[in-house]
Amino acid sequence: MDIEDEENMSSSSTDIKENRNLDNMPPKDSSTPGPGEGIPLSNGGGGSTSRKRPLEEGSNGHSKYRLKKRRKTPGPVLPKNALMQLNEIKPGLQYMLLSQTGPVHAPLFVMSVEVNGQVFEGSGPTKKKAKLHAAEKALRSFVQFPNASEAHLAMGRTLSVNTDFTSDQADFPDTLFNGFETPDKSEPPFYVGSNGDDSFSSSGDVSLSASPVPASLTQPPLPIPPPFPPPSGKNPVMILNELRPGLKYDFLSESGESHAKSFVMSVVVDGQFFEGSGRNKKLAKARAAQSALATVFNLHLDQTPSRQPVLSEGLQLHLPQVLADAVSRLVLGKFSDLTDNFSSPHARRKVLSGVVMTTGTDVKDAKVISVSTGTKCINGEYMSDRGLALNDCHAEIISRRSLLRFLYAQLELYLNNKEDQKKSIFQKSERGGFRLKDTVQFHLYISTSPCGDARIFSPHEPVLEGMTPDSHQLTEPADRHPNRKARGQLRTKIESGEGTIPVRSNASIQTWDGVLQGERLLTMSCSDKIARWNVVGIQGSLLSIFVEPIYFSSIILGSLYHGDHLSRAMYQRISNIEDLPPLYTLNKPLLSGISNAEARQPGKAPNFSVNWTVGDATIEVINATTGKDELGRPSRLCKHALYCRWMRVHGKVPPHLLRTKITKPTTYHESKLAAREYQAAKARLFTAFIKAGLGAWVEKPTEQDQFSFTP
């Protein structure tokens, strides 16, 4: 490349930068034209690096100024408000000023309009806003939709708004901050529709209705009008401010560890309360606005399928995102209480899990049942043939074992006396034994996707996927390769480490002596175990002798949520299961992420696991390598401890209330085999995995269960 070419390239690039700011150049003196006036063209002197512009010849042959045309940047197409839509439906309406009250600095105008023989009034701080509210009331009178936008859609008119709400323009202007918010110029822009820390969730927060009972429980739901796209380049706070000016946002709470704070903001729109959470007040405020837009105006800002909640097949007592965010906050809040606001050395963790119980339609009455942490399994040399060591200290597994303690306590409460029966979550079943009361539901929270099939294919937050540099469009496709052989495979955890590996075809049986001689002790992944719970229930084999199968109503992830991968891991891969015993089913719970995704926990995973069950005074800390506490004592969650609880309940339950007749159990293993229907369901599950080509379930050496009850 010669020198002349280089100079041309340099001048060309400089010219582009300069042209970009031509309109913003201030006049240097009185002879220099201002913005929009004629701009003198360069003659090339003075060492200017800009490229010469072609001169235009006047009639006398002299050069003249070429007028710079100012480009108009088209603004976003806004959705038509009620006033505009009513005018299209009923042109020529007359609005009358009825009254003006209030002080000069804060007047209140009342306007009226007559439509179809009815007079509608609206009030506001300006005549324009008063007319708008009157028009909204008029629209509601003859259109069966809750707001103007839905009325517009119902009458066959569509809003053609070409938007890209994930563009870089969707950041907050400083003018919309509350007084207590200070914009951080170094923060990257967040994108509506992502699921990471700097972004919005799958469907945002969705508010609780003013009524405690969802309409879907009492009457058939009305058809939901199709959502319309939002104006481009505008964030939820800006959009809501245009639709409902003057709203006040309230700061509710602040929680979380120092590196992963969570703030909660609220706003009231049309008498309904909405809240949102985020890693700063700005994001929390935006999510509260997003919630209001979704509920009041049917304006959904994120339609990415893989980040949407996967609804359950059963009765849905709660709005999905409200439930997910509430469960997350409750578990994190309880863990904070148990660890002195995360200051305890045992607050260190990679994964946090918990079980929350709801007893009705209001999530405000939800109760944390268990909290746990952990990411490791026992070393083979520490196996116990007396049931005194915990094999698997992964957080979600420990949370479920803690839940078993609670279920035993509730059964004992029922068996105490008639007064306590009302307090218990159990009631007698007409089919024999006991069952949960109708409104009782359990929800599993895990701070990240469970190890195994659910996590292996979603290692990053969705916001990082599908990014195209030319369009800045954040798109996250569904699983591109759903039929690959690796999808759905059974996987086992690595002994004394982290991560999982696929099962071997010949590794379904482990031997006690083989493990003691150095063979790796294999433990099924958390994804596989949760899939198992979705068939045989979370109560396990021993409790199934007393109670009907119990299933999780929802599984909520704090991060790395991907609807396609999670639903496959939890139940889709075994949809071929058949011939299950009565009352057993393939459970399909609600699957959801949370609005404010948990921050990644950096650093090495601790070697301990923490557990707590409601009623416990303090947490229990277990060495994951040995399966016991640091003093070598067995855990309150070990097989032997839970078998003692089972024996105690068995001694109290009248024989006619047993779902399975068992007289004198001798060993832990025999007691488990007595739960015949449970064992049949488990066998069908293992067969379903094999038939689907996903591998064989690997069980622990049978010697682990050959122990008897010793008080």
From Swiss-Prot:
<dbReference type="GO" id="GO:0005829">
    <property type="term" value="C:cytosol"/>
</dbReference>
<keyword id="KW-0479">Metal-binding</keyword>
<dbReference type="GO" id="GO:0004000">
    <property type="term" value="F:adenosine deaminase activity"/>
</dbReference>
<dbReference type="GO" id="GO:0007274">
    <property type="term" value="P:neuromuscular synaptic transmission"/>
</dbReference>
<dbReference type="GO" id="GO:0003725">
    <property type="term" value="F:double-stranded RNA binding"/>
</dbReference>
<comment type="function">
    <text>Catalyzes the hydrolytic deamination of adenosine to inosine in double-stranded RNA (dsRNA) referred to as A-to-I RNA editing.</text>
</comment>
<feature type="domain" description="DRBM 2">
    <location>
        <begin position="231"/>
        <end position="298"/>
    </location>
</feature>
<dbReference type="Pfam" id="PF02137">
    <property type="entry name" value="A_deamin"/>
</dbReference>
<dbReference type="GO" id="GO:0060384">
    <property type="term" value="P:innervation"/>
</dbReference>
<feature type="binding site">
    <location>
        <position position="639"/>
    </location>
    <ligand>
        <name>1D-myo-inositol hexakisphosphate</name>
    </ligand>
</feature>
<keyword id="KW-0597">Phosphoprotein</keyword>
<dbReference type="GO" id="GO:0006397">
    <property type="term" value="P:mRNA processing"/>
</dbReference>
<dbReference type="GO" id="GO:0005634">
    <property type="term" value="C:nucleus"/>
</dbReference>
<keyword id="KW-0507">mRNA processing</keyword>
<feature type="compositionally biased region" description="Basic residues">
    <location>
        <begin position="63"/>
        <end position="73"/>
    </location>
</feature>
<dbReference type="GO" id="GO:0050884">
    <property type="term" value="P:neuromuscular process controlling posture"/>
</dbReference>
<protein>
    <recommendedName>
        <fullName>Double-stranded RNA-specific editase 1</fullName>
        <ecNumber>3.5.4.37</ecNumber>
    </recommendedName>
</protein>
<comment type="subunit">
    <text>Homodimer. Homodimerization is essential for its catalytic activity. Can form heterodimers with isoform 5 of ADAR/ADAR1.</text>
</comment>
<keyword id="KW-0378">Hydrolase</keyword>
<dbReference type="GO" id="GO:0005654">
    <property type="term" value="C:nucleoplasm"/>
</dbReference>
<dbReference type="InterPro" id="IPR014720">
    <property type="entry name" value="dsRBD_dom"/>
</dbReference>
<dbReference type="GO" id="GO:0045202">
    <property type="term" value="C:synapse"/>
</dbReference>
<dbReference type="GO" id="GO:0003723">
    <property type="term" value="F:RNA binding"/>
</dbReference>
<feature type="binding site">
    <location>
        <position position="400"/>
    </location>
    <ligand>
        <name>1D-myo-inositol hexakisphosphate</name>
    </ligand>
</feature>
<dbReference type="GO" id="GO:0097049">
    <property type="term" value="P:motor neuron apoptotic process"/>
</dbReference>
<keyword id="KW-0539">Nucleus</keyword>
<dbReference type="GO" id="GO:0035264">
    <property type="term" value="P:multicellular organism growth"/>
</dbReference>
<dbReference type="GO" id="GO:0006382">
    <property type="term" value="P:adenosine to inosine editing"/>
</dbReference>
<feature type="region of interest" description="Interaction with substrate RNA">
    <location>
        <begin position="104"/>
        <end position="105"/>
    </location>
</feature>
<feature type="domain" description="DRBM 1">
    <location>
        <begin position="78"/>
        <end position="144"/>
    </location>
</feature>
<dbReference type="Pfam" id="PF00035">
    <property type="entry name" value="dsrm"/>
</dbReference>
<dbReference type="InterPro" id="IPR044458">
    <property type="entry name" value="ADAR2_DSRM_1"/>
</dbReference>
<feature type="binding site">
    <location>
        <position position="682"/>
    </location>
    <ligand>
        <name>1D-myo-inositol hexakisphosphate</name>
    </ligand>
</feature>
<feature type="region of interest" description="Interaction with substrate RNA">
    <location>
        <begin position="83"/>
        <end position="88"/>
    </location>
</feature>
<dbReference type="GO" id="GO:0046872">
    <property type="term" value="F:metal ion binding"/>
</dbReference>
<dbReference type="GO" id="GO:0051726">
    <property type="term" value="P:regulation of cell cycle"/>
</dbReference>
<feature type="domain" description="A to I editase">
    <location>
        <begin position="370"/>
        <end position="707"/>
    </location>
</feature>
<feature type="compositionally biased region" description="Low complexity">
    <location>
        <begin position="192"/>
        <end position="213"/>
    </location>
</feature>
<dbReference type="GO" id="GO:0006396">
    <property type="term" value="P:RNA processing"/>
</dbReference>
<feature type="active site" description="Proton donor">
    <location>
        <position position="396"/>
    </location>
</feature>
<keyword id="KW-0677">Repeat</keyword>
<feature type="region of interest" description="Disordered">
    <location>
        <begin position="176"/>
        <end position="220"/>
    </location>
</feature>
